[in-house]
């Protein structure tokens, strides 16, 4: 099931980048998303409605958004991804190039929790590993 979980995470990331609403089928109804401490909003979003609100919030802040997954740690029911994000701030016009790290928790092939971290080491530790 582990590799399947990695594939689910990649499909969610790819679907989000395409703006594909079918991506919600891979996300549990009771999902919790916790923004990383490096992001200005610092919010926690709940359920499909929350995920959709996060997309709206994100698109209000950023344009020309690009994301590349740099590394993936397959941890069974958890997956850690290290991403490179590039975008332009809509209000500031400033081009941003930053690394983010996400810890994804899956149950029955769906994402139930997605939490952002400031560093890869912090996410791996939260997943029960030390880097």
Each model region followed by its residue ranges:
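Short acidic-aromatic low-complexity motifs
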Residues: 2-30, 130
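A solvent-exposed, acidic/Ser-Thr-rich amphipathic alpha-helical stretch
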Residues: 21, 26-77
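Short, surface-exposed coil-to-beta transition loops
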Residues: 65-67, 95-102
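A short hydrophobic beta-strand element
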Residues: 76-85
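Hydrophobic beta-strand positions in extracellular immunoglobulin-like domains
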Residues: 85-87, 106
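Short, cysteine-centered beta-strand-loop-beta hairpins and adjacent loop/turn segments enriched
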Residues: 87-95
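Short beta-strand edge/turn micro-motifs at domain boundaries
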Residues: 102-125
């Amino acid at each position: 099931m582990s590799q399947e979980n990695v594939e689910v995470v990649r499909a969610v990331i790819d679907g989000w980048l395409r703006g594909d609403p079918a991506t919600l089928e891979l996300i549990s109804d009771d999902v919790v998303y916790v923004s990383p401490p490096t992001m200005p909003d610092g919010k926690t979003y709940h359920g499909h409605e929350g995920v959709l609100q996060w997309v709206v919030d994100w698109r209000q802040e950023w344009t020309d958004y690009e994301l590349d997954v740099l590394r993936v740690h397959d941890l069974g029911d958890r997956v850690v991804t290290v991403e490179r994000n590039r975008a332009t701030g809509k209000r500031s016009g400033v081009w941003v190039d930053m690394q983010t790290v996400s810890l994804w928790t899956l149950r029955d092939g769906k994402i139930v929790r997605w939490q952002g971290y400031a560093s890869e080491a912090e996410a791996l530790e939260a997943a029960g590993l030390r880097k």
